Amino acid sequence: MTDNSKIRVVVGMSGGVDSSVTALLLKEQGYDVIGVFMKNWDDTDEFGVCTATEDYKDVAAVADQIGIPYYSVNFEKEYWDRVFEYFLAEYRAGRTPNPDVMCNKEIKFKAFLDYAMTLGADYVATGHYAQVKRDENGTVHMLRGADNGKDQTYFLSQLSQEQLQKTLFPLGHLQKSEVREIAERAGLATAKKKDSTGICFIGEKNFKQFLSQYLPAQKGRMMTIDGRDMGEHAGLMYYTIGQRGGLGIGGQHGGDNQPWFVVGKDLSQNILYVGQGFYHEALMSNSLDASVIHFTREMPEEFTFECTAKFRYRQPDSHVTVHVRGDKAEVVFAEPQRAITPGQAVVFYDGKECLGGGMIDMAYKNGQPCQYI
């Protein structure tokens, strides 16, 4: 059996069951394990469901049970500067950001990794459902988690080779149900704790109310593509492409009784465009432009390749051709795609391997920009 006792692994512990089991498994495998709780958001003046104080108590309880030292580190400034400012800027620009992708890139695998190194870490570990595999040349490949429903490589797609070289994902080969079983068998304090949802580190707050604290909403006109007035919208930032609920128009104004969806935004005129039907023609596109293109291992500056891609989390893969030009790419779809949303991540896969991805700038239909922004 390998002696891991001289290998120090610093585990990012959130107070949830996944990171608790991550720490437990590493301890059982003989590693020198340290737990670290990251405080990334000041919730003292908020009425959120999730509180950092309760989570830290859970981290302390689990660390004591496992028998590992634990620390708390405050990344509120880093989170605000590197993630939250970006999040607000994207909404201001009419896009729908994915803060979890940026949070992993900038906080969990940058600020936290840097902090772990000061504790003498050889590796960091998190409770993400993903896998890392080292090839004969020492290159680390990031693979999907074995639990298809929980795979989180979409959110980890901006990680660099340097970050992956220093990362362990002990849950990657497990199903979520197995993780719960391990926690219950070990009697961990977090075994029955429900999974967190909501924005990375901000918790389950009322999103509309939360956003309005930071960005003043500007009401405006709601219209169909052909110019029919449909009433008033509450502020473009509250709507995302392809959204159905929250429009306040129900089945009215249409002869065919199909539901209404957000099909576009005009930021300069502050107009929200809506249309009837899940597959409304304005929602369909056959290519996209992306920026911040990044690969998890070394790739040429300019090249073209075929692969599969996801345009949002928990979406089946779609076949695409990718034309890479530096940190930008054109992604052409084999089949038309619905509701490609600027600000979201496009993530590339080769079978089980996550190759990387970028941020969606604009969708196109037969070379013409979709009426999104």
From Swiss-Prot:
Its main location: cytoplasm. It catalyses: S-sulfanyl-L-cysteinyl-[protein] + uridine(34) in tRNA + AH2 + ATP = 2-thiouridine(34) in tRNA + L-cysteinyl-[protein] + A + AMP + diphosphate + H(+). Disulfide bonds join C103-C200. The keyword Thylakoid does not apply. Residues 98-100 are annotated as: Interaction with target base in tRNA. It holds the Pfam family tRNA_Me_trans. The keyword Transport does not apply. PANTHER family: MITOCHONDRIAL TRNA-SPECIFIC 2-THIOURIDYLASE 1, TRNA 5-METHYLAMINOMETHYL-2-THIOURIDYLATE -METHYLTRANSFERASE. This is tRNA-specific 2-thiouridylase MnmA. It comes from Streptococcus pyogenes serotype M12 (strain MGAS2096). The lineage of its organism: Bacteria, Bacillati, Bacillota, Bacilli, Lactobacillales.
